């Protein structure tokens, strides 16, 4: 018999039903469960697949550069970044009629094009690219890196080049390599690029390979570096009248601490950014030399963990046993990596709009909205994944003997206290926030808006004031004009910071009021509830009072029959599944809030947000309905326009989202009956019954149907909001 899919599981390959296909897809990446897997092969497969991942990333970024160089308008955009719309790529569509061709021919293009809302134009411009030739060169270089990554991946699957398990478990060497070799050296290299190419570029000097060695990035060269007069590199920065990309008003400084924003581009000073990367580089280069490898100097991580005895014995045996637990569990390591990456991705979302690093990106409102939303959703998926792999660790890798009375075991020992506290916090936030919103809603409905309960966020305003925002009238720290911190700030450090905080033209420290207070607590409700579900899923993954032997059933099981008092819905996978819905809704509230507050800020009518955001009808009517009006007007006498594609996507997103409920609400029995009826009809229909199937059709399992439903819900949700976000913002601001 020929080898059937899946080859990695002979048991599944012999399954006579369509379960073979779906379970095969579901377990394709669960290398641990494959036939003939060894620890060594597991590590080697994952390692080699990383190179494949890198190849895909390099190919994708190469494609971005190539298509903009080929079909975009980068050179025209560089001449006038505020008024030329950046083109992502051309649209070739034989179905376009004349009205559609006209609607999508924008940005000075000869035919229909897509506008770029990703910020790549601003990024490439800021780092010194100026011509299409530059873009083509970058695309070719990344293509070369992509090929190199593929070769490296193939090479590390060859017997001679396969690393051993001991190599993968050498934590100190890996840490040193990642800290110094990847973070440290790449940050230093990036500082070099900024100082040698980007900063001269921002001052009208075009540095390329042909003149790279002739152009001094600083008039005094390396003299100040070797003589210890490093402050000379900060003298004579660009003036506030500097025109970006020209020598007009430019200075000679390369490493500064100006603070605030470049007045024309509304982005951080490039010389501040270079200084930041240099500091990061030095920090990580030092950090990467702290752990003991072949040279016998530095710390052993195991010794560090074993030596740490918590004060007063309140954490039992502290970190004893943790080193081997973490080092021998890929799921634990992946959980830690995903948790870190998730937090970083969310921080990227927050910082890209509040402290924009790329020239002119702050004035491209649609791009700002798209990037914020994109990074917050990505962060949500990554963070839920962290808890999923944490739960798998507890089921597959956790050894109670090895971790007796250490911090990990003690988390499990007092899990009831953790879960009940999270539950209490979620209930408190939910009832109080909803109570305030509903009360205010009723007051508005009865025509007595003055009876709303409006709470000023005084603690948050006090924190903003401490950082220098003066409009609230708190005389504290940096907003206290006669304090030492304020006076030092004017001269020594970040003189531009206080101006930036108090300017209303940027998104730094937005003025907040009762509407912000309410939505902040709604978001806190979502965050705490999502965390509750995820933490409970991981801490109960090994077992609970209801089902003490849960770990023997694996990560995802539907239930253990009707005889145990209801064991459905309690697998660790079910917790992940439920948490994703909460995560999506929470980030929905986050992005609604961000988007509405910024739309009113950009349009100059902040009072609309302030007045309408304190009650539910305000959100539904003045944010969702008002801003989706262009997307739901259907056919009109004006015909096609450039928002039509988003209107279609808005509808299509709703369709995909709604399809999810078909899988989520009706389960296996209904579909099995339906399938058997359809199979009966098929076998008795002339012509149709000439087509046979090798696998007997059966319904999806409960867990699989939930996954398919969840995927539709997530994808539909994000498609719908993406279309709404981009159309409502670009429709207003172009």
Curated annotation (Swiss-Prot):
InterPro entries: PSI_PsaA/B, PSI_PsaA/B_CS, PSI_PsaA/B_sf, PSI_PsaB. SUPFAM superfamilies: Photosystem I subunits PsaA/PsaB. It is found in: Plastid, Chloroplast thylakoid membrane. Chlorophyll a B1 binds at residue 654. The chain crosses the membrane at residues 46-69, 135-158, 175-199, 273-291, 330-353, 369-395, 417-439, 517-535, 575-596, 643-665, 707-727. P700 is a chlorophyll a/chlorophyll a' dimer, A0 is one or more chlorophyll a, A1 is one or both phylloquinones and FX is a shared 4Fe-4S iron-sulfur center. It is a multi-pass membrane protein. GO terms for molecular function: 4 iron, 4 sulfur cluster binding; chlorophyll binding; electron transfer activity; magnesium ion binding; oxidoreductase activity. [4Fe-4S] cluster binds at residues 559, 568. One of its GO terms (biological process) is photosynthesis. Phylloquinone binds at residue 671. GO terms for cellular component: chloroplast thylakoid membrane; photosystem I. Belongs to the PsaA/PsaB family. The PsaA/B heterodimer binds the P700 chlorophyll special pair and subsequent electron acceptors. PSI consists of a core antenna complex that captures photons, and an electron transfer chain that converts photonic excitation into a charge separation. The eukaryotic PSI reaction center is composed of at least 11 subunits. This is Photosystem I P700 chlorophyll a apoprotein A2. It comes from Gossypium barbadense.
